[in-house]
Regions:
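PLP-dependent aminotransferase-like
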Residues: 69-158, 165
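Short beta-strand segments
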Residues: 5-7, 58, 131
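N-terminal "arm"/small-domain region of PLP-dependent enzymes with the aminotransferase-like
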Residues: 1-31, 36
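Phosphate-binding glycine-rich loop
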Residues: 31-78, 91-96, 101-104
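Solvent-exposed, non-membrane alpha-helical residues enriched in polar/charged side chains
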Residues: 20, 24, 42-46, 66-69, ...
Length: 167
């Protein structure tokens, strides 16, 4: 018997009518790029997260790349990333011209291992990009302390943990 890796049809079928009706409504509304639907999403998602603001972007890769660009990350820089993550994490670093430096995960959480972060820091390291996986936040107290001790930026990727709470 073949077991599918990921059955998106099964996940989609129970909510297909609702999703398709919303897509059709938005498509028929006209201004769906930077329009009222985006503003509605940003407000609702910020409320869900308990955040004062939210910026809706095309995808997580764009969000990570913009964050790294805002930090001034570029050629010659290194960014510490989890070895266990979606490819967008590494691509965002590469698209800025920097080098992703992989760190293995902790066996108990599958999130980036702070001890591995310490070992991976070089004179070219500019940032740490932890990814909160499977709804489980990374050890941010330790990661923030490491970053502060080495004067590094931290850019958190929460694309796989929407709504998760740390502590």
């Amino acid at each position: 018997m073949k077991v599918p890796f990921l059955n998106l049809e099964a996940a989609h079928s129970s909510i297909a009518a609702e999703i398709e009706a919303e897509l059709l409504r938005v498509a028929r509304s006209g201004p769906y790029v930077l329009g009222p639907e985006l503003e509605r999403f940003e407000t609702a998602f910020a409320d869900y997260l308990g955040a004062p603001h939210c910026a809706g972007l095309a995808n997580g890769l764009d969000a990570l790349r913009l964050g790294l660009m805002a930090m001034g990350i570029g050629p010659g820089d290194e960014v510490i990333v989890p070895a266990n993550t979606y490819i967008a994490t590494w691509l965002a670093v590469s698209q800025c011209g920097a080098t992703p430096v992989p760190v293995e995960p902790r066996e108990d959480t599958y999130n980036i291992d702070p001890d591995g972060i310490r070992a991976a820091i070089t004179e070219r390291t500019r940032a740490i990009l932890p990814v909160h996986l499977y709804g489980q936040p990374a050890d941010m107290d330790t990661i923030e302390a490491i970053a502060e001790a080495h004067d590094l930026w931290v850019l958190e990727d929460g694309a796989q943990a929407h709504g998760a709470r740390y502590k």
